[in-house]
Structure formats: C-alpha cells, structure tokens
C-alpha cells in the first residue's frame, strides 16, 4: 500500500469513527464504560414493586419538603436564579428523604473516593444503614415542565470517565431516574409531580466532538494577530 492509499484509508476510518451513533441502549453504554450491568426493574417481583412504592413515597415527601421551604432552595436557603439550576438543588432534598428508607450517598469511584460530578447523582442502599447493607440502586435526579417534556433537546447526559478509576459505578444494580415536574410561582420553583424512570430501557445517541481548553486555544504559537484595548 502506498502512502496516498494509506492516508486515504486512515481518513476514511476516522470519518466513520467520528459519526454520531444513534439508538444505543443505555444498558450497553454503562456496561462498556463501567464493566457493570444495569438490572431492569420487574414490577411482577415483590422486591422491585416494594422498592418502587417506597421511592414513590419518598418523591411525595420531597414535594412536601419543598413546600415547607417555600420552594426549592439551595443548601444555604437561597432560591436558584435559573430554572436549569433547580435540579441540582433538589438533590439534597432527595438525599435527606431517602435516608429514611435506606442510606443515600454521593457515589464513589472504584478507589472509594466520593465524586459529585457526572452520572449518577446518588448511590442508594435501600433498607440499609451503611454501604453494602441493603440493596444498591443508582439514582439520577432530573426536572421537567409541561412545555419541555416532549422537546427533542438533549437533557440526559452520561460521559465516560477519562480513566477507569473515575467511574462512579461499582455494582450491578438498577439505574433509576427520579424526575420532578417543576412550576414557577412568583420567584420560587415548586415540584408539583414526579416520574420514576427505569433507565435500563433508555435508548439514546452518542455524539463525538472535538474540544480544547482556553490554555490550548490561546497558545502564543497559534495567535496570528491580537490587540488589547486598555
């Protein structure tokens, strides 16, 4: 193979690799990036039905707790400035309530280090009082409203960790999304409903992208002209 054919083949392969992947199951994605399986929920099983019933009770309690605080508040008691921040601040309500039904923590990596960023939001030991006590369930917190529930915009993200030690999944387990319906009343945001979603059945896409940091973008050898008005 001559150099021209070689580079043409490399370019062709890269072009195919960089194409978005459509309709991949979340279960497959999680198994590839973590090595662990998503266990589907089967409501014909007593233990699964009991789990979902208790999570539904917990979601109702979260809604009531939000009412008591006069809408969703940060841990410091402030109202989120933007609606897309609300989901982040519902998490502490959810953790507090889930601790009545088990043991809820920020997920740990394989090295045992807690990591708040990335998927999933919560590692929940159902009916347990500590780690490895009870049944483990991974939980992601989301929000929605009547206007955006049928939107085609991407709202659910999970990215592979740069290294295997950064993955926040350590067990085969159910993966559930607790999504709260949000309505704005005055300046405050209230939860007025919820959905419990079995992520084992979710299908989505993988979109590759090129990215660079500011440090990489603004290197001196890249800049061909600049001006700074002082």
UniProtKB/Swiss-Prot annotation:
It is an enzyme of class 3 (hydrolase). It catalyses: Endonucleolytic cleavage of DNA to give specific double-stranded fragments with terminal 5'-phosphates. The keyword Transmembrane helix does not apply. Its EC number is 3.1.21.4. One of its GO terms (biological process) is DNA restriction-modification system. It comes from the Archaea. Keywords: DNA-binding, Endonuclease, Hydrolase, Nuclease, Restriction system. GO terms for molecular function: DNA binding; type II site-specific deoxyribonuclease activity. A P subtype restriction enzyme that recognizes the double-stranded sequence 5'-GTAC-3'; the cleavage site is unknown. This is Type II restriction enzyme MjaV. It comes from Methanocaldococcus jannaschii (strain ATCC 43067 / DSM 2661 / JAL-1 / JCM 10045 / NBRC 100440).
